[in-house]
Amino acid sequence: MNKILINTPERNKQLIDSYGRTIDYLRISVTDRCNFRCTYCMPENMKFLPKDDLLTFEEMDNLCSLFIARGIKKIRLSGGEPLARKGLIDFISNLSRFISYGDLKEITLTTNGSLLNKMSKQLYDSGIRRINVSLDTLIKDKFYQITRRDDLENVINGIMTAKNNGLKIKINTVVIKNKNFNEINEIIEWAHKNDFDISLIETMPMGLTDQDRIDQYVSLIDVEKEI
């Protein structure tokens, strides 16, 4: 693919927010589909967008090119589960040309980890160097309760495979009342032992999945007291 708009007059017009801060980070959801059904995220019978309503990868590439021309330096790909969308690796490989041009610093990705066993080497080869993995528990039964999928062993193996394939890993853990709140210290210890960064995240106390999310909410103030 050719460079798009990188050498046009628009190149120097950086994006500025209402507080005068330069915007250099873009997050793109490549799909709303996911192979998990986390209780704080979506119901079991989730109705997804028609595929024709999603941007094609060519359209996403053009969109990214426009943002890069306005000063975006970092792009994060997310979903849904981004690795579930066919053609993602080719999209990343094409987008990585901007890294080689010096116009983009990095492309990162957020995943639930379920497809890392098969795809982590492809991710590395396509230009990805860092990934975030959503992991809320290290206990098999709890994992099923949270994700509605019996896939913990595969996810853990996938994370380790990704590490062995050269990817830097950050664990994202959503803290959930009566689910993993009393396990947080163990998760942090496991992450640090394996040289993973970790972020603890509040579940948003709004909206409905199968239940009001306020029932699952734990403030980070309470988490700090726990650890």
Region roles according to the model:
Residues L54-F57, R149, I214-Y217, I221:
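Short, conserved loop/turn and helix-capping segments at secondary-structure boundaries
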Residues N2-I107:
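Conserved alpha-helical substructure of the radical SAM core
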Residues N178-K179, S199-L220:
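Flexible glycine/acidic-rich beta-alpha junction loops that bind and position SAM and/or redox cofactors
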Residues N165-G166, V218-I227:
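C-terminal accessory region of radical SAM enzymes
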Residues I28, S93, N185, I221, ...:
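Active-site phosphate/pyrophosphate- and oxyanion-stabilizing loops and adjacent acidic/basic residues
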Residues T31, P43-E44, S134-D136, I201-T203:
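Generic beta-structure capping elements
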Residues M46-P50, I139-I146, G207-Q211:
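A short acidic, helix-capping loop that chelates divalent metal ions and anchors anionic groups
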Residues F57-L77, A84-I201:
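Radical SAM/AdoMet-radical enzyme domain recognition
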